[in-house]
């Protein structure tokens, strides 16, 4: 039920790859081992221990910006056309007006969006395949609380359909620097599709509904709430349906003709990968490019 709620599809339609290696090492034996011995016997299907930045995961990307130099980044700059000729990407158009000539393109755009922007367009077969692959969208609802702590859990999961959300986490439990010493926060994840009513609904109404559930769960009281907000994240996760590999292989076979194109990230590779995978992949791309 949790998987169906998370992905929006019956589990019978999902590929085992959607576990993202979290099932690796999972067996009756390891389950018993962890139950008896606890955290010291965590196996590879669970997070186990890991390093976490003092001020949140965003620090990684702040440091990348500092290293590359802020003037080298363009914000509010939507790619609206990707022009190619023969076996090379020649230029990209920004906001339908500014054209940039390029030597090499690295894309983490959702595959379907990338293909839609290609000029000339791909064959109809490729476009039809790209329209059939799906992404799951997420709404984050954030609560800032005048309370020292909620509990010690890294994450809390909610498979019951009576709740809109699937997961709640308390950032302070990752790093104590994520909140003042006498305050905390909760981040609530709501998976959906952009066509769902919940995505299209008034966000203040959504916040109030989630807040009511959290009050009923006794996570905090109304007078402990300092502030709240919500963020929409489109194309947060690729949905790996059964036999998705055949579809993606055809798309990759088509895109392999471009000798100056690299794809990366969850959306670009259509893979349920993680930040450390993306960092490694990005480094490999840059190292290979610097050798050319």
Residue ranges of each PLM-predicted region?
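Short, surface-exposed acidic
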Residues: 1, 11-14, 126-130, 220-227
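Active-site/ligand-binding neighborhood in enzyme catalytic cores
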Residues: 1-84
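Mid-domain catalytic core of redox enzymes
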Residues: 78-200, 204, 208-219, 231, ...
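Short FAD-binding loop at a beta-strand-to-alpha-helix junction that anchors the flavin cofactor
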Residues: 186-187, 251-272, 278
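Charged, often glycine-rich, active-site loop that binds/positions anionic groups
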Residues: 237-247
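Internal hydrophobic alpha-helix adjacent to the cofactor/substrate pocket in enzyme cavities
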Residues: 279-292
